[in-house]
Regions:
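Active-site microenvironment for binding and transforming phosphate-containing groups
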Residues: 1-283
C-alpha cells in the first residue's frame, strides 16, 4: 500500500512489520534504547468490517475477544507484555495522571478506577502507557536524563487547553524534568488541509494563541469555514514551554489522508476503530 506523506521532511516515521503486524516508530525514539514505543496502523489484527483489522477500542461496538487478540498481537510485535499496559480515559480534558506500579494492566486486563484522563506520566520500568486516536493528536514525551515518559491525547479542545504544556509542567514537578532535555513527538493525526472547523473553534484558539501565530495556525475559506493546523499549534506550545526545536519530531502523516492505512473519524464519518499510541520504559 502506498502511504501519502504530508511532506518530504527527513526523517519520516519508520514503517515496521513484525509478526505480520504493521506499526510506526520515530527515529529519535529508536535511538533511546531504554524506551519501547510505537503507533499502530489498521494492519495485523483480527477485527472485521469497519474495524478491520487492528482496532484497539473496546467501546465502539467491536467484538471484545477480537480487541483483546489485537492487543496481544500489537504488544507482541512491539516487544512488551500486554498485561503491562495502562490506558487513558479520554474526555478531551488537560488532566494528566501519574501512573505507578499499582496501575499495571488497567483498562486491558483489569478495570480502570479513574476517569477524565487524557495524559499519563510515569517513571516505572515495565509499564507501557497507551492512548487512542482516529484524527486527534498523539503527543509523546521522553526525558532521557531522568528516565521518565508521558503520553497525551490532544484534540482541538486539548490543544486549546495546552495539554502539552500541562504535561511538561507535571513532568517537571514529579520527576525534575527540564524542558530542554525532553524529546517530544507529535503523532499521526489529521492535517490542516483535511481539518475544516467552524468559526467558534477558531475563536477559542484566538483566545489562547498570540496574534503573531495566527497565519501559521489557520486560514479562512470562502464558505466561512477555516482550515486549522493542530500540528503547528502543538509545536508552538512545545516551543513556548522551552522544548528546543531540534527535539521535536513532527508526524508528516495524516490519518484522514490515509484512511486505508490509519483509522480516521472524518474520512469514515465515524464508522471506524481506534489506533493506539504506546510508550514504555524497558524493564
Amino acid at each position: 500500500m502506498k502511504i501519502k506523506w504530508n511532506s518530504e521532511q527527513i526523517p519520516k516515521m519508520n514503517v515496521k512489520n513484525n509478526k505480520d503486524v504493521t506499526f510506526l516508530t520515530y527515529p529519535a525514539y529508536e535511538e533511546m534504547n531504554w524506551l519501547v514505543h510505537g503507533f499502530s496502523t489498521r494492519f495485523g489484527g483480527v477485527s472485521r468490517g469497519i474495524y478491520s483489522s487492528m482496532n484497539l477500542s473496546f467501546t465502539r461496538g467491536d467484538d471484545e475477544s477480537c480487541v483483546k487478540e489485537n492487543y496481544r498481537r500489537i504488544s507482541d510485535a512491539m516487544g512488551f507484555d500486554m498485561n503491562s499496559i495502562v490506558t487513558s480515559d479520554q474526555t478531551h480534558t488537560n488532566n494528566v495522571r501519574k501512573v505507578t506500579e499499582k496501575d499495571r494492566g488497567k483498562g486491558i486486563v483489569i478495570p480502570r478506577d479513574y476517569t477524565d484522563t487524557d495524559g499519563m506520566i510515569t517513571n516505572v520500568p515495565g509499564l507501557v502507557l497507551a492512548t487512542f486516536y482516529a484524527d486527534c493528536v498523539p503527543l509523546y514525551f521522553a526525558d532521557p536524563v531522568n528516565h521518565a515518559i508521558e503520553l497525551s491525547h490532544s484534540g482541538w479542545r486539548g490543544t486549546v487547553q495546552k495539554i502539552g504544556a500541562v504535561t511538561i509542567e507535571k513532568m517537571s514537578e514529579e520527576y525534575g524534568s527540564n524542558p530542554k532535555d525532553l524529546k517530544v513527538a507529535i503523532g499521526p493525526s489529521i492535517c490542516q488541509e483535511c481539518y475544516e472547523v467552524s468559526e467558534d473553534v477558531i475563536e477559542e484558539f484566538e483566545k489562547v494563541f498570540d496574534k503573531k501565530y495566527r497565519n501559521r495556525l489557520f486560514y479562512r475559506k470562502e464558505n466561512g469555514k477555516y482550515q486549522l493546523n493542530l500540528w503547528m499549534a502543538n509545536k508552538i506550545i512545545f516551543l513556548e514551554a522551552g522544548i528546543p526545536e531540534e527535539n521535536i519530531s513532527m508526524p508528516n502523516l495524516c490519518t484522514c489522508c490515509n484512511p486505508e492505512f490509519l483509522f480516521s473519524h472524518r474520512a469514515s464519518h465515524g464508522k471506524r476503530g481506534n489506533l493506539g499510541a504506546f510508550l514504555g520504559i524497558r524493564s
